[in-house]
Amino acid sequence: MSVFSAPQFARTLEIPQVLIAPSIDPLSDKNRELGTGQIEDILQQLGIHSDKPMVTQISRFDRLKDPVGVLEAWRIARRRVDCQLVLAGGGATDDPEGAVVLREVREKASDDPDVHILDLPPTANIEINAIQRASTVIIQKSLKEGFGLTVSEALWKSKPVIAGSVGEIPLQITHKYSGILTHTVEGTAFWIKQLLSAPEFAQSLGANGHNHVRNNFLRTRHMRDYLLAFSYLTGDRSDVIRL
């Protein structure tokens, strides 16, 4: 049996194939609930002030995550709505260009006090959690993506998410219902402005996104899918209850 995370990754094979999407752990440091005081303490340690709406992208500094495009979109949106930008992440061990991209992003930011560029270690899970929970809008402007589970991590925090319509991100976001899908810098800028200007709509997107993740991308669903797959392999399907 072969397991694929999405239909587009499946192949024509002579053995059975199953689709099992990845999932997030809601009890992990990256996703568990945090107190308001704890969030504020972490923001203070990172040098981020909560006096302005926060637009955030959490991703490694990789051209395919388009951090420069996020910066450009934020600058366009800021002409209409006052806000700050957080670009937080790190480099991947298999991406030697990460340091180059990080340097390029810092140069483009030009010491703007409203831009916070954080090169975080791989263990900074609580910090990422706090940043996301303090954010007003979260972006995942990928130009190319696999499943993109960082989108589900953001949706789990009940935040409105603007993401590139690539890879399996559309499985996680239904446009204008559980998030926003975009294709360009200008489109991203438009939706940043719209969501910051329409908090009730932004809140409804966040609530719908949270429910979508709760129903489809948590560990419990992941375990259920594998148990059903194991039952299929044993050949005894008389006691299988499909939920």
Residue ranges and their predicted role:
Residues 143:
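Aromatic "clamp/platform" in nucleotide-sugar-dependent glycosyltransferases that forms part
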Residues 194, 201-216, 222-228, 232:
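A short, well-ordered alpha-helix in the C-terminal region of glycosyltransferases
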Residues 160-163, 173:
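Short hydrophobic beta-strand element within catalytic cores of glycosyltransferases
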Residues 89-93, 97-130:
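Nucleotide-activated donor-binding/catalytic signature segment of Leloir-type glycosyltransferases, i.e.
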Residues 129, 152-156, 167-171, 177:
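Short alpha-helical segment that forms part of, or immediately flanks, the ligand-binding pocket
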Residues 1-43:
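A short, active-site helix/loop in glycosyltransferases that binds the activated sugar's phosphate group
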Residues 175-186, 194-199:
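Conserved acidic donor-binding segment of nucleotide-sugar-dependent glycosyltransferases
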Residues 43-65, 71, 85-86:
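Conserved donor-binding/catalytic core segment of Leloir-type glycosyltransferases
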